[in-house]
Regions:
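Active-site helix of classical SDR
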Residues: 119, 155
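Alpha-helical segment proximal to the catalytic Tyr-Lys
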Residues: 124, 168-172, 233
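Substrate-binding pocket helix/loop in short-chain dehydrogenase/reductase
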Residues: 94-96, 100-105, 201, 205
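Residue(s) in the substrate-gating loop at a strand-loop-helix junction
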Residues: 139
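Canonical Rossmann dinucleotide-binding motif of NAD(H)/NADP(H)-dependent dehydrogenases/reductases
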Residues: 3-33
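The beta1-alpha1 cofactor-binding region of Rossmann-like NAD(H)/NADP(H)-dependent oxidoreductases
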Residues: 39-40, 58-69, 101, 218
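C-terminal substrate-recognition "lid" of short-chain dehydrogenase/reductases
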Residues: 2, 116, 213-242, 247
Length: 248
């Protein structure tokens, strides 16, 4: 088991990539706190996954809630080893000047501020132990942006830069920081990216992916498992593309 004895938090764990990562981590021996704004969703998944899973209803952009989550993880499982910042949102495809300020604020709060808060709240204890892993789920949107998703693209570019900056600053503290850059996947966000889910629009999206398919929760879980395991002990600052060749 590649994560035996490890304690992890996965945000956005009620569905999609987050649920896939949580399932994989537990199968590989980790104890996992599943956190999501959808409290009922993570509660149901945690019950399915058994005693090594717990759930927490969480707004990742709320400092008070993230602080309380840290205390809850410590009380239930012990010292935290892995933080997977997976929670993410987008605005609907639209010209950049028509995106509402509320949607802009929501995108940057969930996609960016969440990582800032997680770093403030979880890193001090990791520094004391001289060990820990952060994994930030970004997107190919931060590398090769699509039109009409401007502020989402920008938020994911921020995630990639933040990941590299965190990695270089935290390396001497024994903390590794990496990111995953998935192409659009079969998750609840897919319809939001496309604007409308039709066979024609799906075909247009797929035509930009050389391997010819969307990413899956299993694809992301396999990549996350490697980067968060001790097998990747020499890997930090990497923004790994899980994109079927889209960004080539």
């Amino acid at each position: 088991m590649r994560l035996l004895g490890k304690i992890a938090i996965v945000t956005g764990a009620a569905s999609g990539f987050g649920a896939g990562i949580a399932r994989k981590f537990i199968a590989e021996g980790a104890q996992v706190m599943l956190a999501d704004l959808n409290g009922a969703g993570v509660q149901t998944l945690a019950a399915e996954l058994g005693d090594t899973a717990a759930s927490y209803q969480l707004d990742v952009a709320d400092r008070t809630q993230v602080t309380a989550l840290a205390a809850d993880v410590e009380a239930q499982f012990g010292a935290l080893d892995i933080v997977v910042n997976n929670a993410g949102v987008t605005h609907l495809p639209t010209p950049m000047e028509t995106v509402s300020e509320a949607d802009f604020d929501r995108v940057f709060a969930v996609n960016c501020k969440s990582i800032y808060l997680a770093s403030q709240i979880f890193i001090p204890a990791m520094k004391q132990r001289k060990s820990g892993v952060f994994l930030n789920v970004s997107s190919t949107a931060g590398i090769s942006p699509r039109p009409n998703l401007n502020w989402y693209n920008a938020s994911k570019g921020w995630v990639n830069t933040a990941t590299e900056t965190m990695a270089i600053e935290l390396a001497q503290s024994g903390i590794r920081v990496n990111a995953l850059n998935p192409v659009a996947g079969e998750t609840p966000l897919l319809k939001s990216f496309m604007g409308e889910d039709t066979p024609e629009i799906r075909a247009k999206f797929l035509s930009t992916i050389p391997l010819g398919r969307f990413s899956t929760p299993e694809d992301m879980a396999n990549a996350a498992l490697y980067l968060c395991s001790d097998e990747a002990s020499m890997i930090t600052g990497v923004c790994l593309r899980v994109d079927g060749g889209r960004c080539i």
